[in-house]
Amino acid sequence: MPYIILEDQTRLYYETHGSGTPILFIHGVLMSGQFFHKQFSVLSANYQCIRLDLRGHGESDKVLHGHTISQYARDIREFLNAMELDHVVLAGWSMGAFVVWDYLNQFGNDNIQAAVIIDQSASDYQWEGWEHGPFDFDGLKTAMHAIQTDPLPFYESFIQNMFAEPPAETETEWMLAEILKQPAAISSTILFNQTAADYRGTLQNINVPALLCFGEDKKFFSTAAGEHLRSNIPNATLVTFPKSSHCPFLEEPDAFNSTLLSFLDGVIGKS
């Protein structure tokens, strides 16, 4: 199994598929790079598709330190440097979008040529005057308590809410298996950190072309959250998926892959 070892000796699992301009897929909280498996066979014909499991997730080391969005972004920086990747497209789903934004805030876009944001608002928390956050304080406490005391029903409900239509039992089983690879101590730590993250004030700093992909079934986010991003990110394109909730790349993979290819072809053609 391919791993890269970070400076703090944490091993991150990754896979590469295809060659060409690199697309680094960054998964959401509790998840893994395996959630992007429906992209690799199509996109790898023209691009180098990379799945990376963030620290504490999937097949990566379950270290008990470093579980913040800012550290995950630094891990991405170290990964890109070690792999000698340039002109990278960062594709972040859910919490992965926070990692993309934090990366650009910390390091700029010297080796990044585009960003793909998949179903994520600028903050998950319901700050005063902010209507696009799925968590209030009571909801966050409930989620963290469930992870520590009775995680299985919470995770099963979480998976169901990620889809507009209930996924097949076999689909639910492999997704649940991926989530359960993560110890509860890590799950609750990163859930708290990512829920408190707030990128509303830095969206205007994103100075690479950005594709915004949102499901129209608003179990997690409404398309209005995507419209807010489009209004605040200088060079952003919003595409919505009518049969999707939180996972258009799994729920409507053909439409998602086609949309991503069209966006990338336009960006690469202009670079």
Curated annotation (Swiss-Prot):
EC numbers: 3.-.-.-
InterPro entries, sorted: AB_hydrolase_1, AB_hydrolase_fold, AB_hydrolase_sf
Record-annotated active site: 94, 217, 246
Gene induction: Expressed under the control of the sigma-W factor SigW.
Domain of life of the native organism: Bacteria
Record key words, sorted: Hydrolase
UniProt GO molecular function: hydrolase activity
An example Gene Ontology CC term for this record: membrane
Pfam families xref list: Abhydrolase_6
Record Gene3D superfamilies: alpha/beta hydrolase
Family, per entry: Belongs to the AB hydrolase superfamily.
This protein's name: AB hydrolase superfamily protein YdjP
Source organism (scientific name): Bacillus subtilis (strain 168)
Record lineage: Bacteria, Bacillati, Bacillota, Bacilli, Bacillales
